[in-house]
Amino acid sequence: ETQADLPGSARHDRVVKVVNTKVQLDPFYAKFVTNKGSGVGEGYWEETIAPGVSTGLDPSTMPHELVNTGTNAFTFKPITYINRLVGDDETNSHPSFVGKKINGAFFHSNRLGFLSDDNVIMSQAGDFFNFYHTTATTITASDPIDLSCSSTRPLQLHAAVPAPNGLVLISQNQQFLIFSESGSLTPRDSRITGLSNFEMDSKIPPVEVGTSFYFVSKTPAFSRVFSYTLTGVNTPPNVVDIAKVVTEYIPSSITDLQSSPQNSFIVLYSETDNTIYYYRFYKAT
């Protein structure tokens, strides 16, 4: 059946499961809404959620927001996430971060994204707090994206950096690129490919400068700093050890990395030391 085969008169709020036999569509649930809003009568059917399934996310366990409410005044509060309104656990499943730790958050391509284990999860396009599909019958270009990185080793994604070709996904020992041949990340077109196997400190987020980003890699005795430039989807990235000329000069106690893209420099420092390590570069004209 299809929704068009359902009766035009029924009890208000009656829910049925529609299994399509004429077209290639997933089963879905429909709720009847009478014209008068109660009782039995004529009305229309609208797609709804399956009876008895969870309606969505628990805001108390999700990332919160810090809102500027005035001069030097901020409010830290839960976010109101959009509930699951249609489908069930098969046709409109929970995002893969449910029941797991979220290790990072970012905005990209008009979507809010989270990193959890080896998964990258991105919200509805233009609807940052909606991680569910709008319909269970088909996939739309604006629907959420939920993909995992294929690797032979366990990994935890902890950072994401925008790139001309897509988004670089970073774990402690591997880097990946999520991209789309069409140029726009969508549930159908998005792909993840491996880029490199550099060790990156998971507690110091990389910073962007122009078309490159910089990251810290530590040994027990000192820290190394690298620049990372993506050269294409199918070509190795250009990675340079910019601290090689001062090997073992930067201590392993470094806790933060910051950048000034406009002034073409990065700085490193430690919360336990008053020394700043400064690196500036000049672009050839």
What is each residue range found by the language model?
Residues 46, 53-68, 111-135, 216, ...:
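Eukaryotic alpha-helical scaffold "rod" segments
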Residues 17, 22, 31, 36, ...:
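Context-gated lysine
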Residues 72-87, 115-141, 178-183:
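Beta-propeller domains
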Residues 119, 126, 148-285:
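Beta-sheet-dominated scaffold domains
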Residues 93-118, 154-161:
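Beta-strand-rich domains and repeat architectures in extracellular enzymes and scaffolds
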Residues 77-100, 137-153, 249:
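A short helix->beta-strand "capping" segment at the edge of beta-propeller domains
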Residues 1-96:
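Long, charge-dense tracts
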